[in-house]
Regions:
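Hydrophobic, small-residue-rich membrane helices and short re-entrant helix-turn-helix hairpins
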Residues: 241, 295-311
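Secondary-structure capping and boundary motifs in well-ordered enzyme cores
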Residues: 128, 132, 186-191, 314-317, ...
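Transmembrane-helix bundle segments that line or gate the permeation/cavity pathway
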Residues: 18, 26-41, 45-295, 330
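Selective recognition of specific alpha-helical transmembrane segments in multi-pass small-molecule
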Residues: 220-227, 312-329, 361-366
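Long, well-ordered mid-to-C-terminal structural blocks that present hydrophobic/aromatic surfaces
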Residues: 333-366
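N-terminal secretory/membrane targeting signals
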Residues: 1-31
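Select transmembrane alpha-helical segments in multipass membrane proteins
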Residues: 132-138, 221, 319-321, 352-359
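Hydrophobic alpha-helical scaffolding
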Residues: 147, 235-238, 311, 315, ...
């Protein structure tokens, strides 16, 4: 008769063997943006039904296995800051160097967009925005941790501006720090995400370097204006589409930043990461930037456990996640024969309008 321990050992061995076999015998995978197009050897309808059932079954399993969990924050974790090497990496000097490099890359991207070769294949801006930033940062956030919150150059430039103004004007703050309206919730982020995906998927001139540079400047003005009115981290964690999306992806990651024994600070925080008010603050950078070093942890945790928490999900955040999922699916729809047939029956001058309406309708129906 098998014991629970022997069954666990057997199960672990099977999973390990399966993983090794998958790696050893899988064919070479080619990146989506650089490889040849691959058509599925199954009918599109069958693929769509299978994908839909996968989503439904996933939600059912999450509801079944996490519904009875009472200690959502009590998963195993290791504080990496207990190691001297990790404390050195988390020192202000390495962080300042990394953030400065990010600022330099941002400035170089904008200058290349305005003054460089306008051929997208010979300009830095399209590669930096669509490949290195949007795809690369997303993968790092999901597989490692919230890198964007660490290196965000727009936040860094605002911090520098705050420091300069404070020195020149006897400690005067750049932000007015007005209370963030509850009615706004995450709707600015939803609107920003829709505009971004429209530029990526529908706008035919979205790869033109000068247009990318103009878009970065417009985004900078909007972001810095929000920081001035409502505060730096309050705006980023409530209204900035990219900070929120990368933060959601970071919930899959094995690394987290945690504020412990700081409930007095958590009670006054307006960050979505702290709205539960009952557990330690995880990846709530509004709290972490104000906390003392002894209350901060840089933890290694099992992957994807950041998804399991008792944080109240607002309706606007639910819509944002749906828009994120819908637009990724819509990107695949643009490569199907159905969409090609629609474009064949559309006037050239109307293609952008047809695509825009289809994007909104698809996200609404999703």
């Amino acid at each position: 008769m098998f014991t629970n321990r022997s069954l666990d050992t057997f199960s672990t061995g099977c999973r390990f063997t399966l993983a090794i076999g998958t790696i050893a015998f899988s064919p070479i995978a080619v990146g989506h943006g650089f490889g040849q197009r691959y058509d599925l050897p199954v009918p599109l309808l069958l693929w769509v039904i299978g994908a839909g059932l996968t989503v439904v079954v996933s939600f059912v399993m999450v509801g079944v296995f996490s519904g009875g969990c009472k200690t959502l924050g009590s998963y195993p974790r290791v504080n990496l800051l207990k190691a001297s090497l990790m404390r050195g990496l988390a020192h202000w000097l390495p962080l300042a160097v990394i953030r400065t490099i990010a600022v330099i890359l941002l400035i170089a991207t904008v200058l290349a967009g305005f003054f460089g070769n306008q051929d997208p294949f010979y300009n830095l801006a399209p590669v930096m925005v669509w490949v290195v930033w949007w795809v690369g940062i997303a993968f790092v956030c999901a597989l490692v941790g919230d890198l964007w919150a660490l290196i965000n150059p727009f936040r860094t430039l605002f911090v520098w501006a705050e420091w300069i103004i404070g020195r020149l004007m006897n400690g005067r703050q750049l932000s007015t720090v007005r209370p963030y309206p509850l009615a706004l919730s995450m709707w600015p982020a939803v609107a920003g995400l829709l505009i971004f995906f429209w530029a990526e998927l529908i706008w035919s001139a979205g790869s033109v370097p000068k247009n990318i540079a103009v878009a970065i400047v417009i985004y900078s003005v909007v972001t810095w204006s929000g920081m001035v009115v409502y505060g730096r981290d309050v705006w980023l964690q409530n209204a900035d589409a990219f900070s929120i999306v990368f933060g959601i992806l970071a919930r899959f990651a094995p690394l987290e930043l945690r504020l412990v024994n700081g409930k007095a600070l958590i009670r006054t925080c307006t960050s979505p990461a702290c709205r539960s008010k009952s557990l330690d603050c995880v990846n709530g950078y509004h709290c972490l930037t104000k906390a003392e070093s002894e209350h901060r942890e840089w933890n290694l945790r099992p992957p994807a456990l950041g998804l399991v928490n008792d944080q109240q999900v607002t309706f606007s955040m639910m819509v944002l996640v749906i828009v994120l999922l819908a637009t990724v699916t819509f990107d695949g729809l643009l490569e199907t024969r159905l969409w090609t047939h629609i474009l064949d029956r559309t006037l050239t001058s109307e293609i952008r309008w047809v695509g825009s309406v289809a994007l909104v309708l698809f996200a609404s129906a999703f």
